[in-house]
A protein has these predicted regions:
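Glycine/serine-rich phosphate-binding loop and adjoining beta1-alpha1 elements at the start
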Residues: 1-54, 134-136, 140, 153, ...
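Fe-S ferredoxin-like electron-transfer domains
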Residues: 1-130, 142, 183, 192, ...
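Glycine-rich dinucleotide-binding loop and its adjacent helix/turn
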Residues: 26, 30-52, 169, 193-315, ...
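A Rossmann-like FAD-binding core segment of flavoenzymes
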Residues: 121-129, 137-172, 179-188, 257-420, ...
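FAD-site-proximal beta/loop scaffold in flavoenzymes
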Residues: 204-232, 367-373, 387-388, 392-467, ...
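A conserved FAD-binding loop/helix module that cradles the flavin
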Residues: 245, 461-489
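Ferredoxin-reductase
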Residues: 511-601
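Reductase modules of NAD(P)H-dependent flavoproteins
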Residues: 659-837
Length: 837
């Protein structure tokens, strides 16, 4: 980072010198266009001073983070056509700037002043491009540079880019080969964070750092005009010593101020429009305690800002935050031994200046909770003395490293070989090789991981590679060192498909872009959104789900609030593969789900997926389906698939109110016998002779059916081989318990029972952000294990820790309730500008 090894004089800050050089060029008239030209024309590059002619080869780059966009740049300069995909939502830029409208190339205007591209860092559109450079690092780095990088690649006719596309879900390697790609490059980044197996390790208030950073800088919690909810209380303890821990600590302090000020502003506006009593209605004791804390802190910050302005001084916000508990980093070794210090000591220095505390040689042994089940403190053991210390902590962030992102090997067994924790490498002939580990500049860049029989190959870069994992710079270096290998293997065989690159790329718009087909209200609280997304529809299997989002740049604004959805986990109810349609169904809960009703036909959206695991469909079984409310939407396709496989289906469909029932014909098609259950009188009148009706809850209905109190029993519970429960966590837990209690005499001793676990979710890209972490406890051994619910949502009822699931579902409950009131306040203005169903 710095020169002067003798430390006898002021050292030279090399990164700042390089950045200053770039800024000097950019600030010239037409400076960006000059820089753009120099990325393609480089007289100092003897081997390739200008981009090579079109090679006819097409490369699929999976992941548009630092490794992905760097690789795309070099491959285009080598003459290849590149299609980049990313599972994250990527916001569109204006066509006049990017030269792209949807998937169509249009003329773009040159940039005269670089200032025209800049956005305030606290208000900029979180565009999604750049992967971890967008969501995983602090705003001390000017993220306006990401827009420049994006324009360098997006404006080129040899490049296409689609967000909301998950490799392994929407698109697979087999699909890519059939479509005519000559090579696939995996730039998929790091995988799931390390889980701390300690008591109360997933209590309310405990999160993975990746979950926090993604919610902050992609979902939009850090923005004053967003409706994203992410609850953070002081004091905060961050576990870990890497740069992610440093970023998490500094962002925690900054976010806390934004959070409480936004809470106070909306609370006061709602109280003025209605009353304080109406705002507080529905809050429980725990939520009232947090609300009083947030309101008191926000008012204190407001008062301090006013006093500072009157006295002509800086507001002492950091001192206040430290007084309220502040943020402490706890690391198992010395500060000087931490990865953050050895990699970038300046970040540590700045964090300490901002008021962070650093605790050395401390390892977590357990989280203590209060009577609400929320974190109140953490126990940390000194690594040398063995002494245990107790730190107050209302929030605990875990930044203890990540695992390689090798989910594909488990999704497609036999297709991707592993070598330890990483994908196995091969040379250009397809022979196994061992890459150097943790070597930012290996002697030989071994970046190939698979060679197909026809000579086409798959490569891997960045955090997923054993030589280059660890940081953004190494990820970019992997692409710079590895692209010649890709070009050589491409040159070793003729292009798979004739035709020019731009036409090839344009053909993907029709397949990968998602647009709203229509929106229909099914009940007073349930909305169906039908989306045209041909590849997402083609890949769907019963039981899977999607992530639905609208675009921030297209979302309406009301009361100064951008009506941008958080990522919604949406059940795939049905698909029409011929028309490329996917139906997803949302239960309006007061927050982002209420925005589904405002989506307009033809509106572009993100429908990432399908994701999750398909439900296991076995032939010749007797299956009992238990659906609660929205859960019935999932069971349409599952029941139909079981019946098509030759199984018998007994279906208990439960609802709170008579008005909540929908899609009756689809449910009837999915079951041999239905028992309609409703908590509300008079219940339902069956329309088929074999069906039954019951007023009460679903467990009571099962008991009554088994006893014959509802009429003739044609599919006895004694014949049931498999139970699938889908609904609220309380409903699924009740079904799980009833199997060992009231229903035990009626069921086979060794039947198989699963539930579709509705963990809170964010990225839904399988083992990335860790918001969906769910602990399991083996009923026989008592051992605890952890499952990412977005990887496999169908989990054995007897293993799920229902208490932890309920607590994690309520992590943001106060913010969600205030947001529900705020949206209700905003929507009249929004309805004036667009139609709602």
């Amino acid at each position: 980072m710095k020169s002067c090894i003798y430390q006898k004089q002021e050292p030279v800050n090399i990164p700042q010198a390089e950045t200053r050089t770039l800024k000097d060029v950019l600030e010239l008239p037409w400076g960006f266009e000059i820089y753009s030209l120099l990325t393609r024309w480089n007289p100092l590059n003897i081997r390739r001073p200008v981009p090579l002619p079109d090679s006819g080869r097409k490369v699929l780059v999976v992941g548009l983070g630092p490794a992905g966009f760097t690789l795309a740049h070099h491959l285009m300069n080598d003459g290849h056509t590149v299609l980049g995909i990313d599972g994250l939502k990527i916001e569109p830029l204006s066509p006049e700037l990017s030269g792209v409208d949807g998937a169509t190339r249009v003329p773009f205007a040159p940039v005269h002043r670089i200032e025209d591209l800049r956005e305030p860092l606290d208000a900029r559109v979180m565009a999604g491009f750049g992967g971890v450079a967008e969501y995983g690092i602090t705003v001390r780095w000017d993220k306006n540079f990401l827009k420049l990088v994006r324009l360098l690649v997006e404006r080129r006719a040899q490049f296409g880019m689609f967000g909301g596309v998950r490799f392994g879900g929407t698109l697979t390697a087999d699909d890519a080969w059939r479509m005519g790609f000559d090579h696939i490059a995996l730039c998929i980044g790091a995988g799931g964070p390390t889980v701390l197996d300690i008591p109360n390790g997933l209590a309310r208030g405990v999160r993975a750092a990746s979950d926090f950073l993604m919610a902050l800088q992609l979902t939009g919690a850090a923005k004053e005009d967003s409706i994203a909810n992410m609850q953070l209380r002081l004091p905060v303890v961050v576990i870990g010593g890497g740069l992610t821990a440093i970023d998490t600590a500094t962002e925690s302090l900054a976010y806390y101020v934004v959070q409480v000020e936004k809470f106070l502003a909306r609370y006061e506006a709602l109280a003025k429009a209605n009353s304080e009593e109406s705002v507080r209605a529905g809050w429980d004791d725990y939520e009232r305690e947090i609300a009083e804390e947030f309101l008191a802190h926000a008012r204190a910050i407001r008062q301090e800002r006013a006093q500072a302005a009157a006295q002509g001084r800086e507001a002492r916000i950091v001192e206040m935050l430290r007084h309220w508990g502040g943020v402490t980093i706890a690391y198992r070794r010395k500060l000087v031994d931490s990865p953050s210090y050895t990699l970038n000591h300046e970040e540590v220095e700045k964090a300490l200046e901002e008021g962070i505390w650093f605790g050395e040689e401390l390892s977590p042994t357990g989280v203590d909770v209060d009577h609400y089940g929320a974190a109140r403190g953490i126990r940390l053991k000194n690594a040398k003395t063995g002494t245990e210390h107790w730190f107050p902590a209302r929030t605990v962030f875990v930044a203890a490293g990540t695992q390689p992102n090798t989910v594909l090997a488990r999704e497609f067994p036999g297709s991707y070989a592993l070598d330890g924790k990483y994908f196995a490498a091969v040379d250009e002939a397809g022979n196994p090789v061992k890459p150097e580990k943790s070597a930012a500049k290996p002697a030989v860049a071994q970046v190939l991981m698979k060679r197909e029989d026809d000579g086409r190959s798959i490569s891997y870069f960045g955090d997923v590679h054993p030589s280059y994992f660890g940081n953004v710079v190494k990820a970019m270096a992997s692409a710079k060192q590895g692209y010649p290998v890709v070009s050589r293997v491409l040159a070793s065989r003729a292009p798979e498909q004739a035709g020019n690159g731009p036409d090839f790329l344009a053909s993907f718009g029709n397949r990968l872009l998602a647009t709203v087909h229509h929106v229909e209200r099914l009940t007073p609280t349930i909305v169906e959104v039908v989306v045209r997304a041909p590849l997402a529809a083609a890949r769907f299997q019963p039981g899977q789900f999607y992530r639905l989002q609208n675009f921030e740049t297209r979302a309406p604004e009301a009361q100064g609030t951008r009506l941008q959805m958080e990522g919604l986990a949406m059940t795939g109810a049905w698909v029409d593969r011929e028309k490329g349609l996917v139906s997803v169904i949302a239960l309006e809960m007061g927050g982002s789900s209420n925005l589904c009703a405002m989506l307009q036909p033809g509106e572009p959206v993100v429908l990432m997926g399908p994701t999750g695991a398909p439900t296991e469909i076995e032939p010749d079984e007797t299956v009992m389906l238990c659906g609660g409310g929205l859960g019935n939407a999932v069971l349409f396709s599952i029941g139909a698939a079981f019946r098509a496989a030759g199984s018998k289906v007994l279906y208990f469909a439960g609802y709170k109110k008579v008005q909540d029932r929908y899609k009756v014909a689809e449910i009837e098609a999915a079951a041999d016998i239905i028992v309609w259950c409703c908590d509300e009188q008079p219940g339902f009148a069956p329309t088929r002779p074999q069906d039954r009706s019951f007023v009460g809850n679903i467990v009571q209905a099962m008991d009554s059916y088994a006893e014959g109190r509802l009429g003739e029993v044609t599919i006895p519970l004694e014949e049931v081989d498999r139970i699938i429960a889908i609904g609220s966590d309380r409903m699924m837990a009740a079904v799980g318990r009833a199997r060992h209690e009231v229903l035990k005499p009626r069921l086979k001793p060794h039947h198989f029972a699963v539930g579709s676990i509705n963990s809170p979710m964010q990225c839904m890209m399988k083992e990335i952000c860790a918001q969906c972490l769910q602990p399991h406890k083996d009923p026989v051994t008592g051992e605890t294990s952890y499952v990412f619910s977005c990887f496999n949502q169908d989990q054995e009822l007897d293993k799920v820790d229902w208490k932890v699931l309920n607590e994690r579902l309520r992590q943001n409950s106060l913010g969600e309730k205030l947001t529900a009131g705020w949206l209700k306040h905003c929507l009249p203005e929004a309805r004036a500008s667009r139609d709602f169903v």
